[in-house]
Amino acid sequence: MIEFKNKALTIIVNIILGVWQITQWLPAFICLAIFHNCEIYRNKEAGITVLKVNKGYFNGSACFSLGPVIFVTPDCNEEIIKHETGHSWQSIIFGPLFHIVVSLPSICLFLYRRAKNKSREWYYKFWPEYDANRRGHVDVSKVL
């Protein structure tokens, strides 16, 4: 939820964003039902919620973004959270097209990288990953 000093503006903007990002909100609610007992962190500046998911659900430092909700493992570092925040900004921009324009290319790149044993450097040079780093103000040297 994005917050403004004016409460009415906050409500109006968030209703519009809720409708615009419905294709991310619905899967986020399903994930919220699955990943219970999470530690919740709210970044009011970025208007996002970060949920630290129990380690048993993922291997390594897996993270993903569904609109204004970011799911991370406990050992996920701050730069990865910033990267996922960049994807949240992409969600605001692309709205209902987010999964076609961002999620699908991102997942395909991730799977290809794993299958072909490509480096993180290789992965982060492609759009939408490069764009997410830019929007999230990621120090890429700390991620690689």
Which residues fall in each region the model found?
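Active-site scaffold of zinc-dependent metalloenzymes
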Residues: 49-76
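Short alpha-helix carrying the canonical HExxH Zn2+-binding catalytic motif
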Residues: 74-90
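Metalloprotease/metallohydrolase-associated module, dominated by Zn2+-dependent proteases
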Residues: 2-41, 50-53, 58-59, 98-144
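Catalytic Zn2+-binding segment of zinc metalloproteases
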Residues: 85-104
